[in-house]
Design a protein with these regions (language model features):
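Residue-level signal for short, function-critical loop segments
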Residues: 10, 47, 84, 169-174
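Charged/polar, solvent-exposed surface patches and flexible loops
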Residues: 25-29, 61, 65, 128, ...
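Amphipathic alpha-helical scaffolding segments
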Residues: 57-62, 99, 183-186
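Active-site neighborhood of divalent metal-dependent phosphoester bond hydrolases
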Residues: 65, 69-149
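His/acidic metal-ligating clusters that form di-metal
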Residues: 33-40, 148-203
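Generic detector of ordered secondary-structure context
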Residues: 51, 93-95, 160
Length: 203
């Protein structure tokens, strides 16, 4: 049986938060005592707060400590997906607004997948807003440098040749606010390239 630990919405503060510190101490203690056990960890989103531009140091330290507490190999057993707070503030033209304007022109029901398929040039500016997240993910996991994988884009990473893990960024249209719209690049997720990576007899 495979067990995994899913953690989400870390929202680490740059300064010490007593409640957060207590929660982290309790979690790490349970991991070290084996009350919490996992074969791999999936950490999904909000590794910092939107207004703490580029400040991922607390999450970087925590994830290292967590993986050590669980006795896991961070390079093989940690999987990351960004959240809506993991975008950089807009500098210049807003790529989200450009995308929504085009989506509205394409069809009345704002069919995002259709717009991404027809206007692939709109995707890179959306992904570029995750540049600080990309830097953190690359510092944690060498696979994002060696294989050319984009930690903010759709991609597959196998876990120890036993399980395929498909990474989907649902925060493409996020702006750091609570009322953001969710969107994912379904065209890439269903592409022949991704389907090929999902082959090999692994679930």
């Amino acid at each position: 049986m495979v067990q995994w630990l899913h953690i989400s919405d870390l929202h680490f503060q740059p300064n010490t938060d007593p409640d957060q510190e207590s929660l982290i101490r309790a979690l790490l203690a349970d991991c070290r005592s084996r009350k919490i056990q996992a074969d791999f960890v999936a950490a999904t989103g909000d590794f910092h707060n939107f207004w703490d531009t580029g400040n991922y140091l607390a999450s970087w330290r925590f994830l290292h400590t967590l993986m050590e507490a669980l006795g896991l190999d961070i390079t093989r057993d940690l999987f990351l997906v960004p959240g809506n707070h993991d975008v950089n503030p807009v500098e210049g033209a807003d790529p989200v607004q450009a995308f929504l304007t085009q989506a509205q022109a394409d069809c009345r029901d704002l069919h995002y997948a259709c717009t991404l398929t027809k206007h692939g040039d709109l995707l890179n500016p959306l992904l570029e807003r995750f540049r600080s997240y990309r830097a953190m993910a690359g510092a944690l996991l060498p696979v994002y440098g060696a294989d050319g994988l984009d930690p903010a884009g759709v991609h597959v990473r196998p876990w120890r040749d036993r399980l395929n893990i498909l990474h989907l960024n649902t925060a493409l249209l996020s702006n750091g606010e609570r009322d953001h719209m969710d969107a994912v690049d379904l065209g890439a997720a269903c592409s022949p390239a991704i389907q090929e990576q999902l082959k090999g007899g692994l679930p």
